[in-house]
Amino acid sequence: MAAAALRQIWARKFLPVPWLLCGPRRYASSS
């Protein structure tokens, strides 16, 4: 119950992090 809600909150907090890290890195490596 609470674990599922916590999991969603953690996912929302930490899913954008790989995007922010990998995005600029991929963009820099491609150029």
UniProtKB/Swiss-Prot annotation:
What highest taxon heads this organism's lineage? Eukaryota
Q: Where are the transmembrane segments?
A: none
Q: What class of enzyme is it?
A: transferase
State the compartments where it is located.
Answer: Mitochondrion
**GO CC, any one term:** mitochondrion
Main location per the UniProt record: mitochondrion
Q: Which catalytic reaction applies to this protein?
A: L-leucine + 2-oxoglutarate = 4-methyl-2-oxopentanoate + L-glutamate; L-isoleucine + 2-oxoglutarate = (S)-3-methyl-2-oxopentanoate + L-glutamate; L-valine + 2-oxoglutarate = 3-methyl-2-oxobutanoate + L-glutamate
Which E.C. number(s) belong to this protein? 2.6.1.42
Which cofactors is this protein said to need?
pyridoxal 5'-phosphate
Targeting signal (transit peptide) range: 1-27
A single MF term (Gene Ontology): L-leucine-2-oxoglutarate transaminase activity
- Please provide the Gene Ontology terms (biological process) for this protein: amino acid biosynthetic process; branched-chain amino acid biosynthetic process; lipid metabolic process
Q: Does the record's keyword annotation contain Transcription?
A: no
Q: Alphabetically list the UniProt keywords.
A: Amino-acid biosynthesis, Aminotransferase, Branched-chain amino acid biosynthesis, Lipid metabolism, Mitochondrion, Pyridoxal phosphate, Transferase, Transit peptide
The answer to whether the entry has keyword Nucleotide-binding is: no
Which family is annotated? Belongs to the class-IV pyridoxal-phosphate-dependent aminotransferase family.
Q: What is known about its subunit structure?
A: Homodimer.
The task this protein performs is described as: Catalyzes the first reaction in the catabolism of the essential branched chain amino acids leucine, isoleucine, and valine. May also function as a transporter of branched chain alpha-keto acids.
Name assigned to this protein? Branched-chain-amino-acid aminotransferase, mitochondrial
Per the UniProt entry, what species is this protein from, by scientific name? Sus scrofa
